[in-house]
Amino acid sequence: MTPAATATATATTAADASDLTATDPLGDPSSHRVLTGDRPTGPLHLGHYFGTLRNRVRLQDQGVEMFVLVADYQVITDRDIADRLAEHTENLVLDYLAAGLDPERATIFAHSAVPALNQLLLPFLSLVSVAELSRNPTVKDEIAHSSQAAVNGLMFTYPVHQAADILFCKADLVPVGQDQLPHLEVARTVARRFNERYPHADGRAVFPRPRALLSDAPMLPGTDGGKMSKSRGNAVALGADEDTTARIIRGAKTDADRRITYDPSARPEVSGLVLLAALCQERDPEAVAEEIGDGGAAALKRTVIESVNEHFRPLRARRAELATDRGHLRQVLRDGAERANAIADATLAEVREVMGAI
Ligand code: TRP
């Protein structure tokens, strides 16, 4: 699929009426439990940061209970081997901590370290039809971009596994990007069907109905105008140094029109760069484009490079410092797994009870 087709495929899944955006009022922060996560396939990039990472930190700082998942089993959906898994996992934790997630307040864990979470996959899979699994637009998109010769079974079932990620801790809010909305729909379907089929004796439902918490930032495209992705080589990593940042942005695609404007549908490449500078400067993209005016692509890129490097300097300094203590990163994961296991064990016991397994 071309990048343009990708955008269409993901955009066709509309937000559920109950989904929230980052600017919607949350009410009492302590009434929510938030879970979100990332695949440990490489460093997080600026799209992750503006799309979800900074919202997670905002939620944490508001006092919402946070679970942040390193989705290590999800890595083997579209590749045969989870390459350098431990290293990527630690680096993901590093990105989290550098961005401001605080392991004292947020539970950071890898789902392979939580057996009871994974066991929920079995009853959950029985609640979803094969036809539903094969219709998932995000899965279809990933299959189109996969380098594997054959599509494996996990590729079709991982959205149900993701439902287990969300439901094991009974999260009600899931901060995600637009492309994850089909998976949220799966989680809601699983929760609803499970509750209908297996209510508690007193009628109580086991699982809440999880809602997406969508970023208020417009989707940040990669340096080629397509979806920003570590695997597509069009992303600036959060922890990239200033020279690397400059090199990647200098190599970004632009167009022949010297006048810089913000027009995402007609000029995706130029608009992506304008948007990136605007997000870093906390200004409207129109104002940033206006200021560059007839300066052309060279002036635009200079502005973007400066804005990114300036905005991320403190985060990158913190990241470099944290990177010197790998033992601490592993300890964060151990502590997180301990908390997540206690919750997953309790949920699995409840699931087995309502199913009549004990
Ligand atoms: N699928 C998500 C991604 O690729 C990662 C993920 C796994 C996730 N489990 C999750 C996100 C649960 C939110 C909730 O980015």
Language-model regions: role of each:
Residues 2-164, 320:
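N-terminal Rossmann-like or analogous alpha/beta NTP/dinucleotide-binding catalytic cores
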Residues 31-35, 73, 133-135, 181-184, ...:
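Generic detector of short, locally flexible boundary/turn motifs and exposed helical patches
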Residues 93, 100, 128-132, 171, ...:
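A generic secondary-structure signal for well-formed alpha-helical elements
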Residues 40, 174-175, 234:
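A generic structural motif
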Residues 6-10, 188-358:
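Conserved nucleotide- and phosphate/pyrophosphate-binding catalytic cores
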